């Protein structure tokens, strides 16, 4: 995956990292193309081999329950289809790129969830930002910038909710977290959006997983009103 360094997304990244009343918020908004790096190719080969082994076991299995679980219950679609496996690989590669000190290659497709509606995801992020005192950002800037780069209405959205042992912030007094992947197949782009609430004593981390105490620059309070109003949210899944 190739990380796209864009000034407006950097602004969103900065705005999503701040101190709330009872915790520190560490957010990410990162855009990647699906162009494979050498490490991605190794990862894809390993995942593909694992999936092929599962498919071989399926062909040898007489259990209809096992057959159903492999071909129907993946959030990415039937895993006997290469397009489904490829989407899963892109998401794992995105996590590896975003957190290079962690290895997510052992994740399974069932560790993820396909969100049924874009509006529900937007509402969830907006509600979280409202609750922690950054509600204006969600309406006046974030979604407009994201949509500009990935065309939200054309995206499939997946979520990842790991346990504390698997979460990259699990050792950092993690209180809560949310992670979403917006995949636009036609544009060959993946956007990773996450918010994590950490205990007050924990320092921030930059996108490379290192300590980062830099001061964030929030989106301006007097920014132009966004087109992404309540009506837009209500109709985005049409």
UniProtKB/Swiss-Prot annotation:
A single BP term in Gene Ontology: negative regulation of transcription by RNA polymerase III
Cellular component, GO annotation: cytoplasm; nucleus
Principal subcellular localisation of the protein: cytoplasm
Keyword annotations from UniProtKB, A to Z: Cytoplasm, Nucleus, Repressor, Transcription, Transcription regulation
Subunit structure as annotated in this protein's UniProt entry: Interacts with TFIIIB subunit brf1 and RNA polymerase III subunit rpc82.
Summary of the function given for this chain in its UniProt record: Mediator of diverse signals that repress RNA polymerase III transcription. Inhibits the de novo assembly of TFIIIB onto DNA.
Family to which the UniProt record says this protein belongs: Belongs to the MAF1 family.
Protein name: Repressor of RNA polymerase III transcription maf1
Source species of the chain: Schizosaccharomyces pombe (strain 972 / ATCC 24843)
Gene name of the encoded protein: maf1
């Amino acid at each position: 995956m190739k990380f796209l360094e864009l000034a407006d997304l950097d602004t969103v990244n900065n705005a999503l990292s701040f101190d709330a009343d009872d915790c520190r918020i560490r957010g990410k908004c990162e855009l990647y193309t699906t162009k494979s790096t050498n490490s991605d190719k190794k990862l894809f080969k390993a995942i593909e081999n694992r999936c092929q082994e599962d498919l071989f076991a399926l062909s040898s299995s007489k259990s209809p329950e096992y057959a159903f679980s492999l071909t129907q219950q993946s959030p990415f679609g039937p895993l006997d289809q290469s397009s489904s496996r490829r989407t899963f690989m892109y998401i794992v590669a995105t996590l590896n790129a975003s957190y290079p000190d962690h290895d997510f290659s052992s994740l399974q497709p069932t560790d993820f969830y396909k969100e049924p509606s874009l509006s529900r995801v937007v509402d969830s992020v907006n509600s979280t930002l409202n609750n922690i005192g950054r509600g204006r950002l969600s309406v006046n800037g974030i979604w407009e910038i994201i949509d500009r780069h990935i065309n939200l209405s054309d995206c499939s959205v997946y979520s990842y909710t790991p346990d504390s042992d698997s979460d990259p912030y699990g050792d950092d007094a993690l209180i809560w977290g949310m992670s979403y992947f917006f995949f636009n197949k036609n544009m060959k782009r993946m956007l990773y959006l996450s918010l994590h609430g950490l205990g007050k004593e924990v320092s921030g981390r930059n996108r490379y997983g290192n300590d980062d105490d830099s001061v964030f620059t929030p989106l301006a309070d007097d920014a132009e009103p966004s087109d992404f109003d309540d009506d837009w949210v209500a109709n985005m899944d049409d």
